[in-house]
A protein has these predicted regions:
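Core residues of folded domains in eukaryotic genome-function proteins
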Residues: 43-47, 68-71, 118-122, 152-154, ...
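Long, polar low-complexity intrinsically disordered regions
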Residues: 1-44, 177, 191-194, 208-221
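Intrinsically disordered, low-complexity, Lys/Arg-biased terminal tails
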Residues: 131-221
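Short active-site loop/helix that positions an aromatic residue
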Residues: 80-90
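Glycine-rich loop/turn
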Residues: 44-72
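Amphipathic alpha-helical interface segments within eukaryotic helical scaffold
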Residues: 94-161
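Beta-strand elements of modular eukaryotic interaction domains
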Residues: 36-40, 60-61, 71-72, 111-115, ...
Length: 221
C-alpha cells in the first residue's frame, strides 16, 4: 500500500462520500486549499479539479467551452486530496455529457493553454461501468509521479458520454515520441490493460483544426 492509499484510509474514517452531483456546484469553496497544512504530506505539484458539462447538440467552440468549464478545488497535499475526493461524485454517477479534469495548478484543461498548445493526449475508450475505477487509478499514478517523464504531464480527464466513457492524459510535447511512448506504456501498467487494448493519440493542434477531442485520432496497439 503506497502513501496515497494509506492516507486515503485515514481520511475515509472522518469523511462521508457525497453521492449527489450538486456537490460540484454548491458550497464547494470550503474545500479549496493551495498550500499543505502543518504535518501534511505535500504533493510534488498543486493540482486543480475542474468540471464541465455541455449539451451535445450544440456545436463546441473555445468561448462556449471556457464558459462551461468550472474550477472546483485546488489541493496541495495528500490529505487535502483525499478530503476533497471523498466528497466528489464518482464519474460513473455523472449523467449526460460531463467531464472531470485534474490538472496541475495554473494549467487550464484547454487545447489553447500555453502549457498544452504543443502537446497532445492519450485516449482510452471504456465500456460503461469502468470509469470510476480507472479514473481513480490514473489520478493516483499521476499524483504519485509514476509516469517518470519530468514535467511533461499536464493533467488527466474522464469524459462521460452516452455510449462509452473516455479516459485521457495530456502531455506538453506531442513531438517527443520517447516521452509519449513512455506515458503509453505506464498507462498500460498502472491500469492493468490487456495487451490488445487499443490506445489512441491526438495532438491538441489537430483537435483545434477539426474542433473535436476524440475524432480522427492515431491508433496504436
Amino acid at each position: 500500500m503506497n502513501q496515497l492509499e494509506h492516507l486515503k484510509d485515514e481520511e475515509e474514517e472522518e469523511e462521508s462520500v457525497c453521492s449527489r452531483e450538486d456537490v460540484i456546484r454548491n458550497n464547494i469553496n470550503r474545500f479549496k486549499a493551495v498550500c499543505p497544512g502543518a504535518g501534511e504530506h505535500p504533493l510534488q505539484y498543486n493540482y486543480t479539479f475542474w468540471y464541465s458539462r455541455r449539451t451535445p447538440s450544440r456545436p463546441a467552440n473555445t468561448q462556449s467551452y471556457e464558459q462551461n468549464i468550472r474550477q472546483i478545488s485546488t489541493v496541495a497535499s495528500v490529505e487535502q486530496f483525499w478530503k476533497f475526493y471523498s466528497h466528489l461524485v464518482r464519474p460513473g454517477d455523472l449523467t449526460g455529457h460531463s467531464d472531470f479534469h485534474l490538472f496541475k495548478e495554473g494549467i487550464k484543461p484547454m487545447w489553447e493553454d500555453e502549457a498544452n498548445r504543443s502537446g497532445g493526449k492519450w485516449i482510452i475508450r471504456l465500456r460503461k461501468g469502468l470509469a470510476s475505477r480507472f479514473w481513480e487509478n490514473i489520478i493516483l499514478a499521476m499524483l504519485g509521479e509514476q509516469f517518470m517523464v519530468g514535467e511533461e504531464i499536464c493533467g488527466v480527464v474522464v469524459s462521460i458520454r452516452f455510449q462509452e466513457d473516455i479516459l485521457s492524459i495530456w502531455n506538453k510535447t506531442a513531438s517527443d515520441h520517447t516521452t509519449t511512448s513512455r506515458i503509453r506504456d505506464t498507462l498500460r501498467r498502472v491500469l492493468n490493460l490487456p495487451p490488445n487494448t487499443i490506445m489512441e493519440y491526438k495532438t491538441h493542434n489537430d483537435s483545434i483544426k477539426d474542433n473535436s477531442s476524440f475524432r480522427n485520432t492515431k491508433i496504436t496497439l
